[in-house]
Structure formats: C-alpha cells, structure tokens
Amino acid sequence: VLIAATSNVDDLARKRGLVPVHGADEHPQAVIQGYDPDIEWSRLEEAAFAVQAGARWYASNPDMTRPTDRGLVPGLGAQLAVVGACVDREPTMAGKPARPLLEATCTRLGCHRPIFVGDRLDTDILGARNAGITSLFVLTGAHGVHDLMDADPDRRPDHIGADLGALLEPPQRVVVGGDAARCDGQLVRQIDGDLEVDLTNHDMAAQLCGVRALLELVWTD
C-alpha cells in the first residue's frame, strides 16, 4: 500500500500485515490517505499515479478544513482534492461521515450510550447520524449558527454547545407552541414571517438557548 499520511499510519498498516511502499512504481494495490500537516507534494503525486494505475483509494475523512488557534487551515479533504483532480473516481471513506470507523470505535470501547462531539455538520454530525449516535455540535470550529440554520435534516445535531464544557451541562429543553419556541426562559417568536428573539440576558448560556429555540422554528422539514 502507498500511504499518504503520517508515519503513525505506516505503523498501523504494518501491524495489520500490510507492506507500505513509497512510490507508484512499486505497484501498490491500494492508496491510503490520512491527514498530514507536513505532507510533501511529491507524495500526493505518487498517490495520484498509483490511483491512475488502478490502485484502490481509501481515505480517513473528507474534512476540507481544520480549525487552529489562528484560523482555518486546509484539511485532508483539500489533500484528497489534489489527487482527485487527476483521477475520475472518489476515495472510499473509512471515517466520518461513513460508518465503519465510528462503529468500530464504539465496539472496541464497549459504548452503550455514546455521544459524538464535532464542529462540522457535513462530516461530524452527518457521520453521527449515519451511525445512529447522539451528536453534540460545538461552536469552536468550521461551522457556525448560520450553517445550522441552513442544515439539511441529516446534518442537524441533537445538542448544541459552546465547547466541550457542554458535556457537563444539562441538555437544553425546548418547548414549541404555535409560532413560538422557548428554551430555559429564552423566547423566539415568528411574526409575519420574521423571527423575533427575546433573551432574558445575553450571556453565552442564554444565547445558546436562544439559538436552540430559533432552530426549532427554522427546522420545519
């Protein structure tokens, strides 16, 4: 196999009896791509050559971006796009939003009521839904409130939080009645096609409850 990922993936491949190679000229049967912040362009070229020659193509996830403390940087999805520009097919995904890695992780850990935390709707939340896992969307990465409002049904999280601290907080409870929704005292009403948000205060908890109530009115399909 030709591996376009970190050395850790090489080690894991060897443990499974696979033989990592470094170039398409070594006729790999498969290409495995995983996120590597230090990937060399030549490695992506070799991956493209191998896939063109008929090697099977696998990837861990399609995340286009990755959040850092300085902003977003290209993720594995961007590296996949480099190879994809040279071939006429898509890689087989092992990780989110596909089910295999999520299900394998739950089985290995013996999970009974897992919750998947993520900041991307198109991979994290979609992956959790595909695997039947409860999801918590956190506002610390690629997607935000506007993305939530436009989310398709299969990309809508079960819970919303500011960050991982939400795991230690009680879940938000929303009560919907007619054209209004209320969450922990925060009220959102639909008036003549417009949404009016009435917050009792403006701390993070209140704002999140306001967002949760708003989404109950927006997510009507």
Region roles according to the model:
Residues L2-D221:
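Asp-based, Mg2+/Mn2+-dependent phosphohydrolase catalytic module
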